[in-house]
Structures are given as structure tokens and as C-alpha cells.
């Protein structure tokens, strides 16, 4: 008979310790079958109070004693071979387990046990199985000194903290998946809060389609929406600008070619007001993608001049249509953040500093709220922000650590390549594939992993899988988990609130955990719920609703923490206008054939007096 005794004199006896006088058949099981990955244990069910039988339940970890080592297994099935139950005497049961690894005691007396993935000595027939010891369970999830944070407790034993290696979780990207209503947003808020506390140097940009995260991070967050966003049109690449002009519809190749030729001319007019339509070719040549300012009026003027120079009437309808699109977009109140008159000034440093929190002034999180914004605006803006995030991290040489969190990521990176916006997909894919080399990280949150681009999902090295009911979504997660932990995912469709299965680089081994409970005032979307509860039906402001419906909100002054005062009465291109000199002299390597212009200069060169 095997009896676990106290490891040292005076050690307190925990509930897994057994008394030598206890009935072995009520406490222990014996291995009756074993293959390379699984084993079957024969045991007896307790028909008195069920306290011992409760140890043999699905999802529990058990231990098989082999003398010098203890094999750890996860119960994934339990049953009776005869499918009959007797109320008299004891009932023989069979417990199916998946072999996870093995635990061995440390070399020094009193040292912590050590857990190893994989099996070096398999259980023999008749080997004794019992409830895993608390010290062994702690060893299974020990992170071996890696920088870690506590995000909850183990589902099997709430006295044991659930820790993740925060540096590995961030640096190799992570994903949080789960169906609607299981607590994804709350779990993400907890992860972000813990990450900020552990990594004060981290900047976080949240793409928030439901306007809910700002209330969960009030002391860390700066809220940005379409009313307060400053993102001038000249910072958009040609593809991104065309998405706005064509309102998400298929583009006209002839109009795009015209834009590609005329935008550099307008940019040259901004830099050299007296140069006319001449554009010097060479190392200093401007392209449609170069992020330097230009005036919409100059672009429209170039279109008019092009139409006047045409000898054939065939191309005039194309240019006329392009001019109409530009004028329509510039007058659309939904695009006020792009075409605000004062944004003609070169405010790129202030714009980037405010969005990406450089310096952060104690608020390293920017929450970009997108609820109510048209899809073509969301597509273009998300593309610009993702592209800038990567470029900033790249050219900062690792000094700027950025996390881009994508809520409902399947909207930006759908599995179907015909859907979504190609530049956004490309920008996020570049972060997923190369971002960790430069300090730009990706967090993916989705309720439909089956609809997410598998290339993006495959780059996420740590997963937090909450309840998933859809079989296709479950299959995607199963394909990402190690074979030795596949049975853990059998619980995906039945897990409770705040529960998740964590696996990947950020944890020692696959772990079923329960997230910490956040205070009620820090739950995502709390402010909106409180407003809805406090308001009454007769308090509805119909006038305000109609104004929002028409997208003509009252203009509000936008605070730019680092912006200089701009004289809106004088525009770039006016005869008496002089631009402020560039504050930084660019180096000879401003241009990079692979990544484009360095954000430090963005192609700006001081003009000679």
C-alpha cells in the first residue's frame, strides 16, 4: 500500500495527505492501461458522501507515483464499464487521463519540485494514482523565474495563482477568443491593466469598435474619437486616401493614376510655393505616399490645369469625376478630422505624439473609439495607425514599445481575402510577422476565430481561449494547441464566466484559469450602462439624436498638448506665407528602400532662404 507521508518533520497535513488506516480502494486508483499519450485508471466510486469520488472528475489533474518521479495526468473522461450503478457497496469506475508530464523532487532537501514536459518513464500496470499534491501542482505551472504577472487563479485550486510571463506574452503577440458575453472585454481590461503596471514603458493603442475600454482604464487612458481625432489627409498613403474618396467601393484605375501623378505636384507646391507645377526628379523627389503636407485647393487646381491641357475629351470625364469625389469628401462632416483647415500646417510631430503618447504624461493608453464611424473611415484610419505604429517602433530602434490591440479583429483581418481593406490587412500582417523584432506587438481579440486570417492567428504565440460554442471556431483553437494538451479543449463549450484556457509561450503548460474579478466601476462600458439606467424614457433628447444622425455635431475645440498656435488666415502657398524652418536636419539615409521615410523627418528638408 502506498502512503504519502510528510516531507519534513512538522509539515502540516493537507487535504491530499492520506492516513495509513484509510481504505485504499476509496482513495487510490491503479493504472490498467497505458499508451504513448493516455492511460486508464481503475478506481472505486465513493457511495457515502462523494468527497473522494469528486477527485476523479473531468478537468482535474492527478498524479501517478513511480517512485523517483510522479507522472501528471489530466482527467478527460470517466465512466463505468457496465453502465450500471449499485447503491450497495462500491462501484468500480474507469478514469481516462491524458499524460501531461512528470514531476521530480529537487536535488537539495526541501527544494521545490521540478516539472518537465514529456514523459521519460511511463506508468506501469498497477501503478498507484492519487490526487496531485499542491506543491506538485504549483510546479506544473511554475514559470522558472520569468518576469510574470498574476491574472487569476487555477480552476482546480483557487489557492494557487495563475501567472503568465508578461514579456513573452507581449513580445510574441497574444489572442483572446470567446463567444459574446463570456467576459472577453473584462479579461482584456485586466490584462492591459496588469501589463501597464508591470511594463511602465509600454504604450498601448486600442482599436475599440464599441467605445467600452476607456471606462475600464480611466487613470491610464486618453480617449480619441472622430470629434477629437487629428489625422490630416496628407498622412494617408494613396491606397488609404482612395478608400476614403471611393467610400469603400471599387476604385477607378484611371482616377488612381491621375492622383498618383497630381498629388506629388501639390506637395511640391506646398514646399516651394513659387515653383509652379514643376517637380524635380531625383533623391529628393516626392511621391503620392510621402507624408508631407499639401493643400486640397492645390490638388484641385492641378486637376483643372490637367483638364485644360488635354487635347482629347476622353480623359476629361475621369478628371471631372475625381474632382467631384475630392470635393465631396472634403465637405463631408464625417471626414472633418482629415480635412480640418488648420491641419494644412505640418503637425505630424504633434499628431503622432498625441496618438502614440510620446511622451505619455502618465497616460500610456490611447483608446480610439470607432462606434458610429462609417466602415470606409475605419478602414483607412486603422490602416494609417497600424502602419505608423510599426514605422515608429522600427525607427526608434526598440526604444518605443507599442502594443496595438484589435478588438473584433476579424473585421480588419478576415479569412476571406476578398473582404476587408487590403492596406489594413497588410499593415497588421507586417506587425504580426516582424513587429516583435522592433518592439511593436499585436493583441488580437475576436469572437469568431474561424473568420480571422489564419496567417495572423498563427503568429500569436499565447492564447486565452474562453467559451466557444461554434464547432468551426473550436477547430481553429485545437489546431493551435499542442497535441499533449488537446483534451483540455474539450471544455471549451462549457466553461463558465471569467474562465479561460491559456496555452502557448506565455505559460509553462496549458492552464485552465479563472480571471480576477475587476471592481464594478472598472468594468468595460460601465459609464454607458450607468447612463442608460439613470436616464428615463421621457428624458430622450430627440434634437441631439437627429444631429448625430445627420453627422453634423457642433464643432468642438481640439486640445493638442504639443501643438503650436496656427494662423488659419494664412495658408501654405500664399505669396506672403513662410513656413517655419525644419527643426531637425535630416541625415543622408532619410530614404529606406524597404520601409520608406523615417518618421523622424518624414522627408522634411529645410529650405534655403
Regions found by a protein language model. Name each.
Residues 247, 429-434, 438-514:
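Conserved ATP-driven motor cores of ASCE-family P-loop NTPases powering translocation/secretion/packaging/pilus
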Residues 174, 368, 443:
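Conserved beta-strand position immediately N-terminal to the Walker
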Residues 194-198, 248, 388-394, 424-442, ...:
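Substrate-engagement module of ASCE P-loop NTPases
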Residues 211-215, 221-222, 233-430:
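P-loop NTPase motor domains
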Residues 256-278, 490-521:
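Conserved AAA+ ATPase small/helical "lid" subdomain
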Residues 2-177, 397-400, 415:
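Basic- and hydrophobic-enriched, low-structure N-terminal and domain-boundary segments
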Residues 497-609:
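Conserved P-loop NTPase motor module
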Residues 146-231, 502, 533-535, 543:
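Glycine-rich phosphate-binding loop of nucleotide-binding enzymes
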Amino acid at each position: 500500500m502506498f502512503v504519502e507521508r510528510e516531507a519534513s518533520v512538522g509539515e502540516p497535513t493537507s487535504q491530499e495527505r492520506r492516513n495509513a488506516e484509510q481504505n485504499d480502494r476509496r482513495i487510490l486508483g491503479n493504472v490498467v492501461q497505458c499508451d504513448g499519450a493516455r492511460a486508464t485508471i481503475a478506481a472505486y466510486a465513493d457511495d457515502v458522501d462523494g468527497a473522494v469520488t469528486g477527485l476523479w472528475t473531468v478537468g482535474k489533474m492527478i498524479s501517478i507515483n513511480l517512485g523517483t518521479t510522479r507522472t501528471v495526468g489530466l482527467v478527460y473522461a470517466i465512466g463505468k464499464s457496465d453502465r450500471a450503478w449499485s447503491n450497495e457497496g462500491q462501484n468500480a469506475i474507469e478514469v481516462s487521463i491524458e499524460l501531461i508530464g512528470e514531476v521530480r523532487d529537487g536535488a537539495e532537501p526541501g527544494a521545490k519540485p521540478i516539472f518537465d514536459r514529456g514523459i521519460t518513464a511511463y506508468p506501469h500496470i498497477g501503478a498507484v494514482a492519487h490526487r496531485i499534491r499542491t506543491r506538485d501542482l504549483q510546479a506544473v505551472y511554475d514559470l522558472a523565474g520569468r518576469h510574470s504577472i498574476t491574472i487569476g487563479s487555477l480552476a482546480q485550486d483557487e489557492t494557487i495563482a495563475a501567472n503568465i510571463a508578461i514579456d513573452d506574452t507581449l513580445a510574441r503577440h497574444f489572442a483572446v477568443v470567446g463567444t459574446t458575453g463570456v467576459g472577453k472585454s473584462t479579461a482584456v481590461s485586466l490584462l492591459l491593466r496588469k501589463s501597464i503596471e508591470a511594463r511602465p514603458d509600454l504604450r498601448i493603442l486600442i482599436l475599440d469598435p464599441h467605445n467600452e475600454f476607456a471606462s475600464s482604464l480611466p487613470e491610464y487612458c486618453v480617449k480619441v474619437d472622430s470629434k477629437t481625432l487629428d489625422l490630416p489627409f496628407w498622412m494617408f498613403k494613396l491606397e488609404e486616401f482612395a478608400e476614403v474618396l471611393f467610400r469603400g467601393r471599387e476604385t477607378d484605375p484611371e482616377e488612381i493614376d491621375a492622383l498618383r501623378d497630381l498629388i506629388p505636384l501639390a506637395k511640391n507646391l506646398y514646399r516651394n510655393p513659387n515653383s509652379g507645377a514643376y517637380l524635380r526628379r531625383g533623391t529628393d523627389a516626392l511621391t503620392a505616399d510621402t507624408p508631407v503636407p499639401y493643400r486640397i485647393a492645390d490638388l484641385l487646381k492641378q486637376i483643372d490645369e490637367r483638364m485644360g491641357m488635354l487635347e482629347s475629351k476622353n480623359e476629361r470625364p475621369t478628371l471631372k469625376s475625381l474632382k467631384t469625389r475630392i470635393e465631396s469628401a472634403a465637405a463631408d462632416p464625417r471626414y472633418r478630422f482629415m480635412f480640418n483647415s488648420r491641419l494644412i500646417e505640418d503637425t505630424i510631430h504633434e499628431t503622432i505624439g498625441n496618438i502614440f503618447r510620446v511622451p505619455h504624461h502618465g497616460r500610456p493608453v490611447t483608446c480610439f473609439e470607432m462606434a458610429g464611424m462609417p466602415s470606409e473611415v475605419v478602414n483607412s484610419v486603422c490602416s494609417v495607425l497600424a502602419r505608423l505604429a510599426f514605422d515608429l517602433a522600427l525607427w526608434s530602434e526598440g526604444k518605443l514599445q507599442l502594443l496595438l490591440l484589435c478588438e473584433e479583429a476579424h473585421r480588419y483581418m478576415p479569412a476571406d481575402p476578398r473582404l476587408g481593406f487590403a492596406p489594413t490587412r497588410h499593415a497588421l500582417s507586417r506587425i504580426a510577422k516582424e513587429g516583435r523584432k522592433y518592439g511593436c506587438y499585436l493583441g488580437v481579440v475576436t469572437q469568431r476565430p474561424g473568420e480571422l486570417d489564419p496567417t495572423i492567428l498563427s503568429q500569436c504565440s499565447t492564447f486565452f481561449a474562453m467559451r466557444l460554442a461554434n464547432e468551426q471556431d473550436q477547430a481553429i483553437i485545437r489546431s493551435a494547441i499542442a497535441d499533449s494538451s488537446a483534451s483540455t479543449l474539450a471544455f471549451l463549450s462549457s466553461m463558465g464566466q471569467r474562465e479561460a484556457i491559456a496555452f502557448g509561450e506565455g505559460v509553462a503548460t496549458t492552464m485552465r484559469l479563472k480571471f480576477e474579478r475587476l471592481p464594478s466601476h472598472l468594468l468595460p462600458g460601465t459609464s454607458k450602462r450607468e447612463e442608460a439606467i439613470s436616464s428615463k424614457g421621457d428624458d430622450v433628447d430627440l434634437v441631439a439624436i437627429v444631429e448625430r444622425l445627420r453627422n453634423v455635431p457642433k464643432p468642438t475645440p481640439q486640445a493638442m498638448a504639443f501643438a503650436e498656435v496656427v494662423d488659419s488666415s494664412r495658408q501654405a502657398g500664399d505669396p506672403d506665407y513662410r513656413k517655419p524652418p525644419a527643426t531637425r536636419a535630416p541625415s543622408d539615409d532619410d530614404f529606406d528602400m524597404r520601409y520608406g521615410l523615417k518618421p523622424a523627418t518624414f522627408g522634411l528638408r529645410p529650405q534655403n532662404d
